[in-house]
Amino acid sequence: MENEFTKVMSERTNEDLIKIVTVEREKYNPTAIEAADLEVEKRKINISEFEKIKEKAIVEKKQKQKVDSNIVGSGVRFLNFLIDTIVWFTLAFIISFLIGFIIQPTDEGIITLIGYIIIFGTFIAYHIIMEIRFQKTIGKFVTKTKVVKLNGEKPTDGDITTRTFCRLIPFDRISFLFVKNGIHDFLSKTKVIKENIS
């Protein structure tokens, strides 16, 4: 018997349908589930393929639940921010001092330009190098937290680079005070979790 979800379910992949009728069943209304069940029946999906996809979906769901239960709160995120800001400014100060000592610029415009380059360069380099190499910054070392992808896996270099440049968005630095994941987490599809899990 067809319903308003029949066409939608007929356009789903076998994997999508199996997830819908098994591990994601509670997310859908009964009419959608009925359409998905009928589509699975209609396609005559091989039982071993069905079970394989179902098991994979169960493992993924458990991993996501484990990651979600270990997301750190705003207080820890704020502490990470404070520690990392101190480290970043300390690095920028040291680099500025060394560069100023070596080249000794006299033009105010050049001094300002060099200052901006050092501040932004240090910020970007600090976060990218630390999070690519260790999945964490100094602040996260102190709080025993780390950056992961939404499924708990280690982020790619691209994920970390995206995450770092998204930190430059105005108000991003305080967005984690209002939501569990900040803007840079949302856009880079990452999370900060307690270090004790994958």
Language-model features: locations:
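Membrane-interfacial and juxtamembrane segments of integral membrane proteins
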Residues: 2-198
